[in-house]
């Protein structure tokens, strides 16, 4: 079958809209028709050469849609089911899934290769195999993906809203609640109010933090943070640190969550300095794995029992927390509709990412055609 998709052929180049051949589902696979796809900063890391995939690759790792067909052996979903995709597949049987850390599932080891778990590909053009970002390729009208990459959701939920819980919302929310361990009465600082950071703010507020301090140079993002749970918002780390010292009588913050688009050494240092004794720094944002971005005092870490940790997907469980967050949304405890700044067509994908770079949107969403 044919499908229209936004494709990257190399780093430093924009997405190109192409018509590709798409294979049908094999054993354990499903055919999905995407309704919506989120514009997440992680795809920009491919363009900026921070993450190096196998090219060419269909972009997009945040998606929601309807199952159109299933291959042999599929038991999780059936045609007609509404699903949200998880950019981390969950096999359920590897060491990490079996010990409750499904966000680290071994199937995720090849998500940048773009192929299926067996190394084969489902997108093709002119004899060339095309990969799919995180084995999903949500910037395509349709895709054939693993059943382990989908989570069934209630069919009365609007998919253009549910799509947000595929990556940014759970990653941010869980960075506060799980990785950060925010508790009622805590002081939590969030650096970077984008698609992940705004949800770290929501997560910290939901956990009952007394002070949720947002740091971002963009004024409208600070305003949105205050709207969705932040108690204070500042343009710089220095301003935030001064306020933390004032609010806590010098005790400093309990958590500092780094949710900037690209992690650099300075923001890690700022976060380390803003936490007090027993405090935790959570690094959620990405950077080029070959670059060193942490340079801290081991002595201070020991004497003050400070913790610096990384987290993938906020240490959440995709199969459980995607559904959980949608229930919280329906109950009014998590805001989703308010996150979307603008919706784009597939052909406007590059415009959407330029808006993201320019700080014009918190969450952009691609709406696929209904055909």
From Swiss-Prot:
<feature type="binding site">
    <location>
        <position position="97"/>
    </location>
    <ligand>
        <name>Zn(2+) 2</name>
    </ligand>
</feature>
<dbReference type="GO" id="GO:0008270">
    <property type="term" value="F:zinc ion binding"/>
</dbReference>
<keyword id="KW-0862">Zinc</keyword>
<feature type="binding site">
    <location>
        <position position="61"/>
    </location>
    <ligand>
        <name>Zn(2+) 1</name>
    </ligand>
</feature>
<dbReference type="InterPro" id="IPR023921">
    <property type="entry name" value="ADH_Zn_actinomycetes"/>
</dbReference>
<dbReference type="GO" id="GO:0046294">
    <property type="term" value="P:formaldehyde catabolic process"/>
</dbReference>
<keyword id="KW-0479">Metal-binding</keyword>
<comment type="similarity">
    <text>Belongs to the zinc-containing alcohol dehydrogenase family.</text>
</comment>
<dbReference type="GO" id="GO:0005829">
    <property type="term" value="C:cytosol"/>
</dbReference>
<feature type="binding site">
    <location>
        <position position="167"/>
    </location>
    <ligand>
        <name>Zn(2+) 1</name>
    </ligand>
</feature>
<protein>
    <recommendedName>
        <fullName>NDMA-dependent alcohol dehydrogenase</fullName>
        <ecNumber>1.1.99.36</ecNumber>
    </recommendedName>
</protein>
<feature type="binding site">
    <location>
        <position position="91"/>
    </location>
    <ligand>
        <name>Zn(2+) 2</name>
    </ligand>
</feature>
<dbReference type="Pfam" id="PF08240">
    <property type="entry name" value="ADH_N"/>
</dbReference>
<comment type="function">
    <text>Catalytically different from common alcohol dehydrogenases. Effective in oxidizing ethanol, other primary alcohols and benzylalcohol only in the presence of p-nitroso-N,N-dimethylaniline (NDMA) as an electron acceptor. NADH acts as a cofactor here instead as a coenzyme.</text>
</comment>
<feature type="binding site">
    <location>
        <position position="40"/>
    </location>
    <ligand>
        <name>Zn(2+) 1</name>
    </ligand>
</feature>
<dbReference type="GO" id="GO:0051903">
    <property type="term" value="F:S-(hydroxymethyl)glutathione dehydrogenase [NAD(P)+] activity"/>
</dbReference>
<keyword id="KW-0520">NAD</keyword>
<comment type="subunit">
    <text>Homotrimer.</text>
</comment>
<dbReference type="InterPro" id="IPR036291">
    <property type="entry name" value="NAD(P)-bd_dom_sf"/>
</dbReference>
<dbReference type="InterPro" id="IPR013154">
    <property type="entry name" value="ADH-like_N"/>
</dbReference>
<feature type="binding site">
    <location>
        <position position="105"/>
    </location>
    <ligand>
        <name>Zn(2+) 2</name>
    </ligand>
</feature>
<dbReference type="Pfam" id="PF00107">
    <property type="entry name" value="ADH_zinc_N"/>
</dbReference>
<dbReference type="InterPro" id="IPR013149">
    <property type="entry name" value="ADH-like_C"/>
</dbReference>
<dbReference type="InterPro" id="IPR011032">
    <property type="entry name" value="GroES-like_sf"/>
</dbReference>
<keyword id="KW-0560">Oxidoreductase</keyword>
<dbReference type="InterPro" id="IPR002328">
    <property type="entry name" value="ADH_Zn_CS"/>
</dbReference>
<dbReference type="InterPro" id="IPR020843">
    <property type="entry name" value="PKS_ER"/>
</dbReference>
<feature type="binding site">
    <location>
        <position position="94"/>
    </location>
    <ligand>
        <name>Zn(2+) 2</name>
    </ligand>
</feature>
């Amino acid at each position: 079958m044919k499908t229209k998709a936004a494709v990257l052929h190399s780093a430093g180049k924009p997405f190109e809209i192409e018509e590709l051949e798409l294979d049908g589902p094999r054993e354990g696979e499903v055919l999905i028709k995407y309704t919506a796809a989120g514009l997440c900063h992680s795809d920009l890391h491919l363009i900026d050469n921070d993450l190096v995939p196998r090219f060419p690759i269909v972009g997009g790792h945040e998606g929601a849609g309807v199952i159109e067909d299933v291959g042999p052996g599929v038991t999780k979903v059936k045609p007609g089911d509404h699903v949200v995709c998880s950019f981390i597949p969950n096999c359920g049987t590897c060491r990490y899934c079996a010990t409750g850390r499904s966000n680290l599932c071994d199937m995720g080891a090849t998500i940048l290769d773009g192929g299926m778990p067996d190394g084969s590909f489902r997108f093709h053009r002119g004899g060339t195999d095309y990969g799919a970002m995180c084995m999903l390729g949500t910037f395509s009208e349709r895709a054939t993906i693993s059943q382990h990459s989908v989570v069934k959701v209630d069919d009365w939920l609007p998919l253009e809203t549910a799509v947000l819980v595929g990556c940014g919302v759970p990653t941010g929310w869980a960075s506060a609640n799980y990785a950060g361990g925010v508790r009622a009465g805590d002081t939590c600082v969030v650096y970077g109010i984008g698609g992940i950071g705004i949800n770290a703010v929501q997560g910290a507020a939901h956990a009952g933090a007394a002070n949720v301090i947002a740091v971002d140079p963009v004024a409208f993002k600070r305003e949105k943070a205050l709207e969705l749970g932040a108690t204070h918002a500042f343009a710089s780390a220095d301003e935030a640190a001064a306020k933390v010292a004032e609010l806590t009588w010098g005790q400093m913050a309990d958590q500092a969550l780094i949710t900037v688009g690209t992690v650099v050494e300075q923001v890690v240092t700022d976060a380390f300095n803003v936490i007090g004794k027993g405090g935790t720094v959570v690094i959620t944002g990405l950077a080029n794995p070959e670059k060193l971005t942490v340079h801290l005092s081991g002595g201070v870490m020991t004497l003050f029992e400070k913790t610096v940790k990384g987290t993938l997907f906020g240490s959440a469980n995709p199969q459980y927390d995607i559904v959980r967050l949608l229930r919280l949304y329906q109950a009014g405890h998590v805001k989703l509709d308010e996150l979307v700044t603008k919706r784009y067509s597939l052909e406007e994908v590059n415009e959407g990412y330029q808006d993201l770079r320019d700080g014009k949107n918190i969450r952009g969403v691609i709406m696929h055609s209904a055909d």
